[in-house]
């Protein structure tokens, strides 16, 4: 996949990062460019692992500035038309890029594609989110980090907002929407997310609520467009509002879901 760059930010994750890089290099259809950004790691094991990564993997070292800054540094270094961020403790499925790239090549108006997420480690299961819907995206975090995006999306948005410590990927996709880019879900598992004590899933709920308020404040103009986005959503096929949840198909009108999530965040 010579047209794709996979960016792997790493801070003291020597026990995982080699597995992440290997999963990127093992893509069907050819290995992408891989950029690993060492965000000021202090762990000797991490230094040792990064020093033995295969030739061709670009290792960038910087002072510790946080994961968003590390992601942005890697994305800025890329010269390919398509980009994907893979956290150092996660893995790509072997056919991830071969699955995500064709829709982007067929539709020049499409900004990014993403698949389903498989959890492994402390908890296992497939996280099935609803298909892409601009209106629903305002109220629910439905897109994971490891989407394949056009380099132009990164240029237009400026990448990850380094002021966000939670929901930074959600903020990126809202930023893209605000600039006219839409996404598309592919109904296949493309990324494996490691569930462990150091992962952010299950982090303090209060911090998430605060981050959501900041998200809405930053994109207040986009949220004011909610009625027009809702009308656009309602014009779609009913299937867009029916998705397979953890335990089976669930019909959830977007407006109902909005009310539920708004109430949840106010608690």
Residue spans for each PLM region:
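Short aromatic/hydrophobic "clamp" motif used to bind/position activated sugar donors
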Residues: 83
């Amino acid at each position: 996949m010579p047209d794709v760059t996979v960016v792997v930010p790493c801070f003291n994750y020597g026990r995982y990062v080699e597995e992440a890089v290997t999963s990127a290099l093992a893509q069907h259809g050819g290995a992408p460019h891989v950029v690993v950004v060492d965000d000021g790691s202090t762990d000797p094991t991490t230094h040792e692992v990064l020093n033995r990564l295969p030739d061709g993997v670009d290792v960038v070292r910087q002072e510790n500035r946080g994961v968003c800054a590390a992601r942005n540094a890697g994305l800025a270094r890329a010269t390919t038309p398509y980009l994907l961020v893979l956290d150092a403790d996660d893995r790509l499925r072997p056919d991830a890029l071969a699955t995500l790239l064709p829709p982007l090549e067929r539709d020049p108006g499409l900004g990014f594609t993403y698949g389903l997420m498989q959890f492994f480690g402390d908890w296992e299961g497939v996280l099935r989110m609803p298909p892409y819907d601009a209106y629903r995206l305002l109220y629910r975090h439905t897109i994971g980090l490891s989407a394949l995006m056009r380099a132009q999306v990164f240029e237009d948005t400026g990448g990850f907002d380094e002021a966000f410590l939670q929901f930074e990927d959600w903020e990126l996709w809202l930023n893209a929407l605000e600039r006219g880019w839409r996404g598309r879900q592919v109904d296949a598992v493309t990324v494996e997310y490691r569930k462990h004590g150091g992962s952010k899933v299950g982090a303090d709920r209060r911090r998430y609520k605060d981050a959501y308020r900041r998200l809405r404040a930053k994109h207040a103009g986009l949220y004011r467009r909610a009625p027009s986005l809702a009308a656009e959503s309602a014009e779609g096929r009913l299937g867009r509002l029916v998705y397979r949840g953890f335990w089976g198909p669930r019909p959830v009108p977007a407006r109902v879901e909005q009310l539920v999530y708004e109430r949840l965040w106010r608690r």
